[in-house]
Amino acid sequence: MMNDIIADALTRIRNAAMRRLEVATLLHSNTVVGVLNVLLQKEYIAGFKVIDGQNNKKTIQVELKYDDNEKSVINEITRVSKPGRRVYKSASEIKNFKNGYGTIIVSTNKGVIANDEAYAANVGGEVLCTVW
């Protein structure tokens, strides 16, 4: 049984990017879909689609994005808040990451959003992961 589906999804994306695969297959979760929406909005991935599988088990296929040199657009993707150690930050604490080159993905009462949106809306929340 898997305890942290978000960490599993991030690891699958990281491993697929290291192998230069075009598509990574993830397990479905509404939170994972929220994280992928932020990654798509910030142009870290090319796209994703939810696929219905057998026995009502859904999967997600993520199209990874690479630059002209066939290097992954995602340099590093790291899980921050974990089931054993939750990390919460206020809006002022998540204002900037990697001098604006990176993104913090935050789960708030307004949904899963990026750090710049959370700062603009003046909401904090659980820091799910960081990407740059």
Swiss-Prot record:
Record key words, sorted: Ribonucleoprotein, Ribosomal protein, RNA-binding, rRNA-binding
Functional description taken from the UniProt entry: One of the primary rRNA binding proteins, it binds directly to 16S rRNA central domain where it helps coordinate assembly of the platform of the 30S subunit.
GO biological process, one term: translation
Name of the protein described by the UniProt record: Small ribosomal subunit protein uS8
Name of the coding gene: rpsH
Gene3D superfamilies documented for this protein: 3.30.1370.30, 3.30.1490.10
InterPro entries xrefs: Ribosomal_uS8, Ribosomal_uS8_CS, Ribosomal_uS8_sf
Organism domain of life: Bacteria
Molecular function as annotated in GO: rRNA binding; structural constituent of ribosome
A Gene Ontology cellular-component term: ribosome
Recorded family membership: Belongs to the universal ribosomal protein uS8 family.
Subunit structure comment from the entry: Part of the 30S ribosomal subunit. Contacts proteins S5 and S12.
